[in-house]
Regions:
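Sequence/structural signature of beta-propeller domains
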Residues: 25, 36-779
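Bacterial N-terminal signal peptides that target proteins for export
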Residues: 2-10
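C-terminal motif of bacterial Sec signal peptides marking the signal peptidase cleavage site
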Residues: 18-21
Length: 779
């Protein structure tokens, strides 16, 4: 879509100089008609006193017992479900991958300290996996799955561990494979969901692989916590199959309890995920008071095709909600996160009237729209369950009941005011590391802890414990900029889809506007207009790139708005000859493609064009890494003059790295204040990140004419801005791909990170406003 400001930036006809270089005699496209800007329907700027502030992100692979030998940093460790000691100071999380629980000191929320781990092997059980934890008094109850893959004979136990010395003082056989645990508010009993989960690779008679029934059925264990732990005993609560059948549950003969929550009356709510049901149990007597279906929902305005496009015109028909996490809103309403596991999942969350079982409110497509607005849509899950809400917690903030909904695939927690359960109000979105599952409010300290389970060391994706603080007292230590720092506006009720922003350019016609583009993570290619006069910055236009009247997909790694109108794109190819400068008219149509000289293209490896800048008669480009024929660590900067079609090349000495598997390259180039600015980065993130910087290079006079076998003149560089402290200031994982920067017409320096479309990445986009370039950049 084109808008008035997009038109002004590209309105002029293409100058004869550029037309000659483009080898075309066609007239430049006329200025497109003015159209309305997209606007954001959400007020993102809550007062500091009314929002959460991210305090810290602690990667749990760093947590090990004091004095223990170093562990393999690449070994998988996760943080799935968390609890906290009654004083609110020690978080305890499950790590099923490493078969242990971990302890983290959060007395200073801005500086979590790992207190080590307790392996189940140390308790004498080498192959058992913790599924949940709950602290009560001086103890923590550790729910352990001992099934070991024998689905037909599930087993489990709950260990009672004294926190002070981490010794097990008691263990209770649960008689089945457990999932979650909850403690009553008065501390008198615990409820444990015994799921006896299905084997997704087993085929029941007459059914398909992974189907139910797969006996034995699940149940709930109630544990009386009166007296010393050695006196604690459990009581099994079975469900009435006939009642489940009458309620319309799927496969009532094989129920699979997933999650439990207890209200102030001692009622236990149980989600029966695969059966698409909810049960309510009297925690004191063990009587099953109610079973009802979670029902179905049809959802429209969502992306249901994994085709590389964020196409929100899709829908799903009436689909079982299949709730995972469940929580009480007061004593009369229940909230569920409708993840889905077998046949369903509706991409949102629902509030039920617990008395009638009727739906009081449903999120519809709003959770997915929230992901799209904030660049957290995961295209590779479009045909499955989209953002996949899984975790949920209910807390109270400033006297207001508040729901916290965790999106497992889009990596965020959404905050809602549920003072009126029939009309929740969205308040805030919190970024997390991948796979947030444990959502742990600590009301006594106005803290929130989120534990994330996805851990892929090879991709730099690490499981973590993230800490957020609510209110003014945590604002000063909160991450800056606050998330989201860039969002998209809505067009006809749907947000502009975006992500994987790998480029920035100033708008020559508007001092408060920038241009950016998505790379090959999404297609077809578009140039996005960004209004930086707002906070957060707002993507409010999307200009499709076309060729011969048809949309095209390009790996756009650089965008330069031409002073005379139109754009130049740096397009990276899978192979050297596919790297091109693409000249685009104001209406998005491709005017010309300019290939790199064959001598250069043939010397490229997997990385090529990564940045572009344009002034009145020159185009500058950055090649990400060295040519095969160039000295190690010397990348190239190129100068192209459209008037004569000539290329001149210069050398640029990259910083070095000693980290195995790491490399350093260029990601952006700009012309500013009579010099070239280049962005240099390594491929590391989080605590490992070392090189994220802008360097200044004086504009050179002479260089090498196209030749790849002639050593280029290496240009002296000078550090202009170390970006690593800016990226670390968010209090999240320092992002790997800082790939775009620009000095806007208002003189400010802006920087953006590429979130890789959430594939093998945590997906958080950081958009930095670093203030006036004259101050932000060293001379």
């Amino acid at each position: 879509m084109t808008t008035s400001h997009l038109s002004r930036a590209a309105a002029a006809t293409i100058a004869a100089l550029l037309l000659a270089a483009c080898s075309t005699t066609e007239e430049a496209s006329e200025t497109p008609p003015e159209t309305p800007k997209a606007t954001s329907p959400i007020d993102w700027n809550l007062p500091a006193s009314e929002r959460y502030h991210r305090q810290a992100t602690y990667p749990v692979y760093l947590n090990k017992p004091i004095g223990a030998p170093p562990e393999d940093p690449a070994a998988e460790t996760v943080a799935e479900i968390s609890t906290v000691t009654p004083d609110g100071n020690t978080v305890i999380y499950t790590d099923a991958a490493a078969k242990r629980i971990g302890f983290v000191d959060v007395r200073d929320p801005a500086k979590p300290v790992g207190l080590g781990t307790l392996s189940l092997k140390e308790l004498g059980h080498a192959d058992d996996q913790p599924t949940s934890v709950a602290a009560v008094g001086e103890f923590v109850l550790v729910v352990v799955d001992t099934t070991g893959g024998d689905f037909a004979n599930p087993s489990g136990r709950v260990d009672v561990v004294r926190v002070s010395d981490r010794t097990r003082v008691h263990s209770i056989d649960l008689g089945g494979q457990p999932d979650s645990i909850a403690i009553s508010s008065d501390g008198t009993f615990a409820a444990i969901a015994i799921e006896n989960q299905r084997d997704e690779e087993f085929t029941p008679a007459g059914k398909e692989e992974g189907d139910l029934p797969q006996p034995p059925t699940g149940f709930v264990q109630l544990v009386n916590l009166a007296g010393a732990p050695t006196a604690w005993k459990s009581r099994k609560v079975d469900f009435d199959v006939d009642a489940a059948r009458q309620a319309g549950l799927d496969t009532p003969g094989d129920l699979e309890p997933e999650y439990v929550s207890i209200n102030s009356r001692g009622q236990v709510a149980v989600s029966l995920q695969e059966n698409n049901g909810i049960a309510i149990i009297d925690g004191k007597t063990g009587a099953v008071q109610k079973i009802f279906s979670a029902g179905t929902a049809s959802v429209s305005g969502i992306d249901t095709a994994e085709d590389g496009k964020i196409d929100q015109s899709g829908s799903i028909p009436e689909t079982p909600r299949e709730p995972d996490a469940i929580g009480w809103i007061g004593d009369d309403h229940l909230a569920t996160a409708n993840e889905g596991d077998w046949k369903g999942g509706t991409r949102g969350w629902t509030v039920f009237d617990a008395t009638t079982g009727e739906v009081a409110w449903d999120a519809g497509n709003t959770v997915e729209q929230l992901a799209v607005r904030t660049g957290l849509h995961i295209e590779s899950r479009a045909e499955s369950k989209g953002p996949e809400p899984e975790g949920l917690a209910i807390t109270e903030i400033d006297g207001r009941p508040t729901a916290l909904i965790a999106s497992e695939r889009s990596n965020f927690v959404a905050v809602y005011d549920v003072s009126d359960p029939a009309a929740p109000r969205f308040r805030q979105i919190l970024p997390t590391t991948p796979g947030p599952e444990g959502v742990l409010p600590i009301p006594s300290r106005n803290l929130l802890v989120v534990s994330s389970e996805a851990d892929e060391a090879d991709n730099g994706v690490r499981a973590s414990v993230s800490v957020y603080g609510y209110g003014d007292q945590y604002a000063a230590a909160g991450g800056k900029p606050a998330f989201p720092s860039i969002v998209s506006g809505d067009v006809d009720g749907a947000p502009i889809g975006w992500g994987a922003l790998g480029a920035l350019s100033a708008d020559p016609a508007n001092e408060n506007r920038l241009y950016t583009s998505t790379d090959s993570a999404y297609g077809p290619a578009r140039i996005l207009g960004v209004d930086v006069s707002q906070t957060p910055a707002v993507i409010d236009t999307a200009l499709p790139i076309t060729e011969d009247g048809k949309p095209v997909t390009l790996d756009v790694e650089g965008v330069a708005a031409r002073p005379d109108g139109g754009f130049v794109l740096a397009v990276e190819g899978e192979k050297g000859p596919d790297n091109q400068l693409v000249f685009v008219a104001a209406d998005g149509s491709i005017e010309n493609r300019v290939s790199l000289p064959s001598e250069i293209a043939d010397g490229l490896g997997g990385q090529g064009l990564e940045g572009v800048a344009a002034d009145d008669n020159t185009v500058w480009v950055a090649l990400q890494r060295e040519l095969k024929t160039d000295p190690k660590g010397v990348a190239r900067i190129g100068r192209y003059t459209p008037a004569d079609g000539k290329w001149v090349w210069f050398g640029y000495q990259l910083d070095s790295t000693a980290v195995e598997g790491d490399w350093i390259g260029l990601s952006e180039i700009a012309v500013h204040d009579g010099a070239l600015l280049v962005l240099e980065r390594d491929k590391l993130n989080g605590p490992d990140a070392r090189v994220k910087a802008i360097y200044r290079v004086e504009i050179p006079e002479d260089g090498v004419l196209t030749a790849a076998d002639q050593a280029p003149k290496v240009l002296p560089k000078k550090l202009a801005r170390d970006l690593l402290p800016d990226l670390q200031a968010t209090n999240g994982f320092a992002q790997e791909k800082v790939e775009g920067f620009a000095v806007a017409g208002n003189g400010k320096l802006f920087v953006v990170t590429d979130n890789d479309g959430l594939d093998d990445a945590n997906g958080e986009t950081v958009f930095l406003d670093l203030g006036t370039a004259g101050t932000a950049l060293q001379k």
